[in-house]
């Protein structure tokens, strides 16, 4: 059976830099930081007191208030981004095509704020105060479940959980379902909402977060010599994927093609990347092989780029090992410098941004590179966006447990 082509026909996002594609992309290209002091809880006693918060989001624009009360915030974000993507795609689910449409939207952690609130209720008021909606309000596959119900989707309905690679893996696996003939259209991506006491406190305890409380907007500084950890973010990025001939037949707008998908495992450490970048190298090369693309065809790479001392260096080394001399010709960018790290939502949001980079032929900047680390010696599109030719782009995501993913996007 010949391999079916997969294209992107709809985009949606909720993010620290905007709550729709137009606003988010505009702020990203302008280099505006979405990192602010935490307002969702009193962070006075925490070592990190800032995050990439979603601002101005009205859940009732997407979900009736009565229903929204029975969902954790990550579900709100995922549903909203999914609804945006479906509207953008112009695709209609009908009784005739419903079994050929699927959804795979995941989360790295899921309903942590709901778990915190419910635990407090349990301790203070006893087990009878636990909401009957607690479990479906918290579990990770409920974004996919709600989108399936809302649109009448009767094909594959699942969610993946692979830490910070979740959103990318969801998109990659959704693309393969289309390639292999299991679906014609898929909604795919990731969402997260862990700007909460346990979310901030847990990563702070692991010494993973920046502590630059005096200037949150400059705290996320990938590849800068003075980077001191990542900044937690929240939101969602979701896209509609479609079989190419199916999209053409209905006259759909096509943003880009998903040409390749690769995965690898570090087999090294619970939280630290391989210092020689080998997991990243193998992952990128697997994606390029899957796409049938040579290394010298790649011009843009949206990196994992978390602003951690170990991670940024390991990814740089991995890129150089994968691309050889061509690595210096690639524009590498980290949009986390503006959004923070959305954990399981990051691969979804950043894949949306990568598709927009291909579609608009622009690399967003990596802001906050004030003193570039000499050991990180690639072109990181420092501080200003750049118009450029992008025929082939890569997107990397890496997660705790040594789980890696890379997507290859091509201009159509």
Language-model features and meaning:
Residues 16, 239-243, 289, 320, ...:
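Short beta-strand-to-turn element immediately C-terminal to the catalytic PLP-Schiff-base lysine
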Residues 8, 24-25, 29-162, 191-202, ...:
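Conserved beta-ketoacyl condensing-enzyme motif
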Residues 124-131, 169-172, 176, 180, ...:
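Glycine-/small-residue-rich "gating" segment that lines the acyl/pantetheine channel
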Residues 1-8, 95-98, 291-297, 328, ...:
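Flexible, low-complexity linker/loop segments at domain and module junctions
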Residues 43, 47-53, 110-114, 193-220, ...:
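Active-site-adjacent elements of ketosynthase-type condensing enzymes
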Residues 1-67, 245-257, 352-367, 410-412:
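ACP-dependent fatty acid/polyketide chain-elongation machinery
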Residues 78-91, 140-144, 148-151, 156-192, ...:
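Active-site-proximal alpha-helical scaffold in enzymes
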Residues 5-9, 36, 214-291, 300:
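Condensing-enzyme catalytic core mediating Claisen C-C bond formation in acyl metabolism
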